[in-house]
Amino acid sequence: MHYIRYLLCTVGSVYIKSKEALAKDILKDLVEMCRSVQHPIRGLFLRSYLAQISRDKLPDIGSEYEGEADTVMDAVDFVLQNFTEMNKLWVRMQHQGPARIEEKLEKERSELRDLVGKNLHVLSQIEGVDLEIYKETVLPRVLEQVNCKDELAQYYLMDCIIQVFPDEYHLQTLEILLGACPQLQPTVDIKTVLSRLMDRLSNYAASSPEILPDFLQVEAFAKLSSAISKVIEAQVDMPIVGAVSLYVSLLTFTLRVHPDRLDYVDQVLGACVKKLSGNPKLEDSKATKQIVALLSAPLEKYSDIVTALTLSNYPRVMDHLDAGTNKIMAKIIIENIMKRDTCVSTADKLRFCFELIKGLIKDLDESTTDELDEEDFKEEQNSVARLIHMLYNDDSEEKAKIIYTVRKHILAGGPMRLPFTVPPLVFSALKLIRRLQGQDGDVAGEKVPATPKNIFQLLSQTIEVLSAVPSPEMALRLYLQCAEAANDCDLEPVSYDFFTQAFVLYEEEVADSKAQVTAIHLIIGTLQRMNVFGVENRDTLTHKATGYSAKLLKKPDQCRAVYACSHLFWVDDQDGIKDGERVLLCLKRSLRIANAAQQMANVTRGSSGPVTLFVEILNKYLYFF
């Protein structure tokens, strides 16, 4: 008996083709005939067969079966009726067996879902289904079936609607479609449904700029935002990760469709803050990843990242991240600034930027030093150092404000960070000083005086903090850099003061013998390039340099440092010092030290040792004489 119905469907198909009767009448009879099969699986396959053999015989526009009596509405009505009955059979399948095989039945239902979905595909292919028919007839009747309270059916049908019908129809019927979302069962994966809808709409908007006014006309953003809020309110048990995923999709839609509307972007972030307000710090790793995706989206979209970062709700979202994730997000922000070669050009922008990366420039929790991974910490601080190098403004006064702002923040970061963050600050300030050469006095009406003397004073105080960390070798190098910059600015007292501080640091803090050798050669090399000092100051400094050279731990080191001091008394510049007598004294002194070193080697090793030092001294004699 069951096979006869398949035969009747085939006969009906041939009868329509013969055109001896109206197509709508035959289709109506076939649909009614299928009602006699109420077994869910048998009924589904029978109606699926009916849909398959009749799809090319529908009275569509341009079809050979269209006529005065056969219209597009007849075709639509037939497909919708068949779809409705198939969906009812499909939903009923879940009640066809005992509870113990419920899982098996759900699996079977999932495998048979495409039989139902084919009807919607057929509807989307009917040429005569324009926007009006879709809005007034098709969508309401399909949504009636979505309201069946069955989780699997609701998810699948909503997904089918979004996938098979044109983007233009979705845009123009957005309010109707979104109105069904809060009515879905709490277990329905609504975030995936809405995400796919927003993806389709954003791709549609990207396909042609001419379409964008339509999005504004239908207020797509407002409707999507409202729908998401209603869904989150209706599904009180929705996990945080689900809610945040919805906001990520909405933000992606906003950035693609309304990239110029920063207020929309901030509104999405604000809605996310509201949802997170009951969770001071996120502990769900999946939710945390979604938050990172949410915060990363504006960075990827806008070329002027600093402007994007001024969104008022951006830092409020970051406040809900744990310390580890906050650092990850801070690194992403810095990496984007580096990648886009963005210049942070004002102190106000810098303050906002530092507020966002505060996880890298200070401790956010009570984590002990022992818990920090040394390599990770170095990488983080190097990121901050690179950011400091990106701070620039052509206006000297504004650049000075930037430097003062940087100093304030990095000094609050604790001693461990200073060796990484102070050097870029110093070099950035020295660039400004070279730009300000020749200026003196305060800038009228400014809280931040942009003059070389004042900035040198600031650097002296900053390096002093670094030397107390302790990081004496780094501090000494920076003192010498500042001394050289003061020399270029013709500021003798300032340069002398930096050298004095370098010598004090060398004597009191540099204890390692290898570090002492490196330090004294740096001092000698820097002092040799100085041309700002008068006779008295230069004599004082050169005397200290030669004295410390002769006091190094190892004789070979003493010898090399002393003959290096000879360059302090003979400078090849036109106006440079040329004191041959003192050059000779240095070389003779180094020769005595070399002799002592060889005698010591003879005593300890029983041999005179290599003559390397004598060859090096000979080279110096040849150079000078």
Regions found by a protein language model. Give the residues of each.
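Extended, charge-rich low-complexity regions and/or helical-solenoid scaffolds
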Residues: M338-F624
